[in-house]
Amino acid sequence: MLDNCKRLLFRKFPCFLSMAPSPLFLTQTPRLLDEFLKGGVVMFPLLLLSILALTTAFERGWFWSRLLIQEDQVVRDVLDAAVEDLVKAREIAEHARHLAIGRFLLAPLKLRHPSPETFRLAMEATADKEFARMRRGDKLLETIIALAPLLGLLGTVTGLIRTFNNLNIGGGGSSAEATQAASGIGEALITTAAGMMVAIFALLVFRVLVSLQSQQMDYFAAVGSELELIYREVWYEPHQPMPNLLMAARIAEP
C-alpha cells in the first residue's frame, strides 16, 4: 500500500524525484564523514575555514556580478547625459548609487559649480572608498591561505605522534602492528590534504578578486578622466577675478 502511494505521488508530482537523495549520495555520505573524523580534532577548524572561504566567495561573487553586469550601461548613460545636461546625468548616477560606479560618478556631479580640481578630488576621494569596499574579504582569504596548510601539517604531526606511541617498537612488531601503523599514517595525512585543498581554493578566489580589483582601478581612472574632460570642455566657466583683487593689482603697479 505504501509503495503504491509513493508511485502515485511521484507520478503526479515528478519534481519530488529530483528532491529525493540519490543512492550514490546516501552511500558516499557516511564514508565522507568517516574520513573527516579520521583526521582528528584539527579537521574542525579546517571545516570552519572552508565555510568562511565559501561564504566569502559567494558574497564577493554576488558583489562583482552585479557591478560588472550593470556598470557599462550606467557609465554610457551618465556620460551621454553629461554632454547635454548635468542635472540629468546626476539623476542617472543617483539612481545607480547602489553600485560602486554610480557612487563614483555621483560624487562630483552633486557639487555646485566646482572647479576642475575640486571635481577631480571628489572622484578620487570616492574612488578610494570604493576600492576599500572592493578589497573586503581579502584579509580573511589571506589568513585562510596561510593558516589552512599549517593546521593540516599540525594534524598530521599529532596523528603521527599518536600512531608511533601506539606501536610496540621494543617488541619487534608484528605484521598486524605494521598494518596498523601504515593505516594510522594514512589517516594522519588526511589533515594535510584537507588543509591544502582549503588553501588552494582560497588562493584561487583571492587571485580572481585581486585581478578584478586591478581592472576596476583602471576602469574607474578612464571613466573619471572622460567625465572630467566633458566637464572642462562643456560646463566649466572660469570665474572672473573679484573687483577688490583687480584694484589691488592696479595699486601694486608702478
From Swiss-Prot:
**What biological-process terms (Gene Ontology) are attached?**
protein import
Report membrane topology.
Answer: Multi-pass membrane protein
What is one GO cellular-component annotation here? plasma membrane
| Principal subcellular localisation of the protein | membrane
List the InterPro entries: ExbB/TolQ_transport (IPR050790), MotA_ExbB_proton_chnl (IPR002898)
User: Which residue ranges run through the membrane?
Assistant: 39-59, 141-161, 185-205
> Does Lipid biosynthesis show up as a keyword for this record?
no
- Where in or outside the cell is it found? Cell inner membrane
Q: Sorted alphabetically, which keywords does the UniProt record give?
A: Cell inner membrane, Cell membrane, Membrane, Protein transport, Transmembrane, Transmembrane helix, Transport
Similarity-based family: Belongs to the ExbB/TolQ family.
Instruction: Briefly state the protein's biological role.
Output: Involved in the TonB-dependent energy-dependent transport of various receptor-bound substrates. Protects ExbD from proteolytic degradation and functionally stabilizes TonB.
Recorded protein name is: Putative biopolymer transport protein ExbB-like 1
Q: Which organism is it from?
A: Synechocystis sp. (strain ATCC 27184 / PCC 6803 / Kazusa)
